[in-house]
Amino acid sequence: MLRIADKTFDSHLFTGTGKFASSQLMVEAIRASGSQLVTLAMKRVDLRQHNDAILAPLIEAGVTLLPNTSGAKTAEEAIFAAQLAREALGTNWLKLEIHPDARWLLPDPIETLKAAEALVKQGFVVLPYCGADPVLCKRLEEVGCAAVMPLGAPIGSNQGLETKAMLEIIIQQSTVPVVVDAGIGVPSHATQALEMGADAVLVNTAIAVADDPVMMATAFRLAVEAGVLARQAVPGNRSTYASATSPLTGFLEALA
């Protein structure tokens, strides 16, 4: 069970809505993933009507919506997008995204912290997408963010946990949930993140661009479940030396 702010989730896998070939395929994949929290970009949704091709199927599926501010380049733009989303969707939950460079899509740490502090004061439940910077993540926690979402690698890159060393520090020091977001390319990456101690992962591109998104979503669901179970089981310590699983000489002595 995962708790963030006032909500609890059975699944530790969050999903996105971009890059799917159709809305029907998107919903089928989300259902196969078991995800209960789904993020969607405000720039891709018609907020004036709930029969939008992306929004309507999600509402019907009964998932918790997490609008994001993707496309915002400044704190001011992100705050404006957040206010529009709250008014249109009736939710104060928000994935805060500010990335001014369209090529790399790396989050702006200064603008993100500035916007996060303002949005928390306005009553938003803020989940900020940020770099894997332990100092920044701690500052975001201190201003009241409900979780932090450090990247594993650049958005859509499928590179995996390239920031593993920093993620481990963030997980160790955080008192709010840590959701590894961006760069997760295959199910084993998700398993690794959960084994490390992350509370959840957010996956979009890896599922949406697969030849069979529904099958890939199922694979991610199982991978996340495996990661959670492995962490709860408490793995053995890593050792430099070999350690025999059975006696090496005792049986020979018994036969002598």
Swiss-Prot record:
Its EC number is 2.8.1.10. It catalyses: [ThiS sulfur-carrier protein]-C-terminal-Gly-aminoethanethioate + 2-iminoacetate + 1-deoxy-D-xylulose 5-phosphate = [ThiS sulfur-carrier protein]-C-terminal Gly-Gly + 2-[(2R,5Z)-2-carboxy-4-methylthiazol-5(2H)-ylidene]ethyl phosphate + 2 H2O + H(+). The keyword Cell membrane does not apply. GO terms for cellular component: cytoplasm. Pathway: Cofactor biosynthesis; thiamine diphosphate biosynthesis. The active site is at K95 (schiff-base intermediate with dxp). GO terms for biological process: thiamine diphosphate biosynthetic process. Keywords: Cytoplasm, Schiff base, Thiamine biosynthesis, Transferase. 1-deoxy-D-xylulose 5-phosphate binds at G156, A182, G183, N204, T205. The keyword Transferase applies. Pfam families: ThiG (PF05690). GO terms for molecular function: thiazole synthase activity. InterPro entries: Aldolase_TIM, Thiazole_synthase_ThiG, ThiG. It is found in: Cytoplasm. Homotetramer. Forms heterodimers with either ThiH or ThiS. Catalyzes the rearrangement of 1-deoxy-D-xylulose 5-phosphate (DXP) to produce the thiazole phosphate moiety of thiamine. Sulfur is provided by the thiocarboxylate moiety of the carrier protein ThiS. In vitro, sulfur can be provided by H(2)S. Belongs to the ThiG family. This is Thiazole synthase. The gene is thiG.
